[in-house]
Structures are given as structure tokens and as C-alpha cells.
């Protein structure tokens, strides 16, 4: 046996393997003898088929099976002697098929897992977001919730931003109708970004019953190719103007949020609890993101190409499953290269985390699984039902284990990291406009 390392890929190895022809032939002969009494061939009594005919009928198939088994056995012995940890499946290339009474010769090509040196992980600095939920955050959330429950009332004044208007419109391109260029009783809220800027500007200031004709040019990148970049004439009739009216924060409003007795203070307490839970979860995500990036920055590791390709397969499958779940057909033109960077990051991080977990004994404990499920169930309307649903299936429990392992690794790093508190607002923490669910 000879082992070679490929210069272009530090994780690729080649092993030259030789399988004894005599050993193959001897095992094939034994199996044919065991098989002969069991086969039935027309013209011969059971168990009386000549061995020559048995060999003609089944010899090639059995030789293939025996050769495969002996080759795999020799390969396993070879990699065990070298203490290789194989990544993926090896590729066997026939170098000599054994047709001239010589031994069977093969070359096995495969990749191995890298040796990962974790180094000093005690010098990592992590910025921890700090936020206390108070009246400001609660009032902002109440405003969002009020806007989500906006009512509209008819008004006798010109249309302005924030109003809901009902219009008829008729568009023409060179005097002819075009697809999507006309509608009756179309309702839209002005200022929410659903209309082209020039089209909306023409509606602003119009009054109920007013008709207006104007020209506008569609953007060059407009999705409707027929009118993209072209000048179009529109005639609009304004049927109705409705002004927004926010609900009062009272008992009825509290009931609309699920507070059965309409207690406003209880509603505010629940909003605060939800914001605190959302804040805790988001801080945890932020810390985890920093820990993962720090590990990638500090630890250099070669990654097996075959694992990257397998990860790309998984990413593509995730995309297709998401499309199917949303009612869209599977994409037929996904380019593997577009997933390469993300796949490499996942594989590299996975190898580092596995090494960290193995080195420091950060395995999953049953009580951690239970705690993880109970905590995440709190964001659902019926936590107890969610908890029972998870524990009813060993497969679901198995899916949670990698998440808990990640949490264990993150906690281990955070216990040793230099934590720097960083005061933030709720909006800064969430990274988007203030919102909350109740």
C-alpha cells in the first residue's frame, strides 16, 4: 500500500490497493458451491445443475460482490493503520482489472478531515447589547399596534399622504390600452410605496368626484416590458377619500389584543413581557453571531471539498422546499456557485464547533433539551401543546440536539470572553422599524 498527498488539495489522499486474485477466486468458488443446491434451471433437477453452468450464470455477479467486499475491507484496514478520518465517500479507480491472472489493482482517492488547532480562545472580545424595556418602548409598540388596527372614515377634503383613496384609472400607450393599465374601484393607501411616484403625485390634492388626465413616463426597469421607459397617458377619477383614524387605547383595544377582560394595565404588562422576551432572544442571536465570526476569524482550517458540495446540495434543497411550501414551482436554473461561499462558511464553522465540543466535552444533556423546548414554546399561543408535540417524536428531539450543541459552544466561549456592555435602543437591537407581537 502506498499513500500520496495531493499538493493542490492538502486534504486529498491516494492509496494504492491490491486484491489477491487467488483470494477472490477461492471465495467465489465457495459461494458458487453454496448457491448451487438452491438454484433452479430448466432441464436440470434441483441441486443437480453442473457447476460450470452455475458459474456461467452467476459467476460474474458473485465475483463483482466478492471483489467489492475485499476491496472495502482492505481499504478500511489501510485507513485505520494511517488513522485517517474519511470525509465523504472514496472513489475507487481500477488500475489493473486482473484479466491477465494478476492481482486486481485499484487507486482509492478520498479526502480526510483536517486537524484543527483551536488555539487560545480566552482573548475574544464580545460586544453585548444592553437594553431595559421601559415606557418608551411600550408606547412605541402601542403606536404600531394602533396603526395596524387603523380604521378609515370618509372625508370631504383633498387627498393627502396617509389617506386611503378609491379610484378608477385608464391608461393608454400611443392611444391604445395596455396590460394592467386600467382598473375600477381600486383602493390604495397614499404614501405606502405601492404606487409609482409620479402616479401618486397626480392623486394628491384631488377631491372626491374629480377627474384628471396626465402624462407620465414609466421607469426603464419597470417590470411591465410593454411600457418600461415609455410615456403613457392616464385618466383618473377619484371616487372616495378616507382619512385614517387610530383606535383609542381602551378596554376594547385591549380585547382586540386578546385581553379578555379588557384590562389596559394587563395589556401593557403583556406587551412589556413580550418585548423583554423578544429582546432576550435578539441579544442571544447577536452574541451568537459574534462568537461564530470570532471563531472563523481566529481559527484557520482547510475544508474538504466533498463536504462543501454536500452542503450546497442541502442549501439547494432548502430553497426548493421553501418554494414548494409557498406554492411556487421548483426552480430549474439554480447555479451552484451562488451557494459556494455560504456552504464553505457552514462547513468551516461546523468543523470548528465539532472540534470545540469534542475537546471540552460540551455534549447535550437531557435537561438541556427540555429547557430549550420549554423556552422556545413560550413564543406560541399554547406552549404546553408545543412542548408535548416535540416530546412525542424522537425525530423532533434529534433535530434539536445540534441547536443545543451550538448553544453549549457559544456559552463556553462567552464564559471566557471579554464582554463589553453596549447600550442600544430597541430599534437598533432589532435592526428594523419598531414592532412587536402580542
Curated annotation (Swiss-Prot):
Molecular function per GO: peptidyl-prolyl cis-trans isomerase activity; protein folding chaperone; ribosome binding
InterPro entries per the UniProt record, alphabetical: PPIase_dom_sf, PPIase_FKBP_dom, Trig_fac, Trigger_fac_C, Trigger_fac_C_sf, Trigger_fac_ribosome-bd_bac, Trigger_fac_ribosome-bd_sf, Trigger_fact/SurA_dom_sf
Assigned EC number: 5.2.1.8
Presence of the UniProt keyword Ribosomal protein in the record: no
UniProt superkingdom: Bacteria
Compartments (UniProt record): Cytoplasm
GO terms for cellular component: cytoplasm
Catalytic activity annotation: [protein]-peptidylproline (omega=180) = [protein]-peptidylproline (omega=0)
Keyword Cytoplasm: yes
Pfam families: FKBP_C, Trigger_C, Trigger_N
Domain PPIase FKBP-type: 162-247
Predominant cellular place of this UniProt entry's protein: cytoplasm
Protein's GO biological process: 'de novo' cotranslational protein folding; cell division; chaperone-mediated protein folding; protein transport; protein unfolding
Main enzyme class: isomerase
UniProt KW keywords: Cell cycle, Cell division, Chaperone, Cytoplasm, Isomerase, Rotamase
Record note on domains: Consists of 3 domains; the N-terminus binds the ribosome, the middle domain has PPIase activity, while the C-terminus has intrinsic chaperone activity on its own.
Family, per entry: Belongs to the FKBP-type PPIase family. Tig subfamily.
Biological function: Involved in protein export. Acts as a chaperone by maintaining the newly synthesized protein in an open conformation. Functions as a peptidyl-prolyl cis-trans isomerase.
Protein name: Trigger factor
Species assigned in the record: Nitrosomonas eutropha (strain DSM 101675 / C91 / Nm57)
Organism classification: Bacteria, Pseudomonadati, Pseudomonadota, Betaproteobacteria, Nitrosomonadales
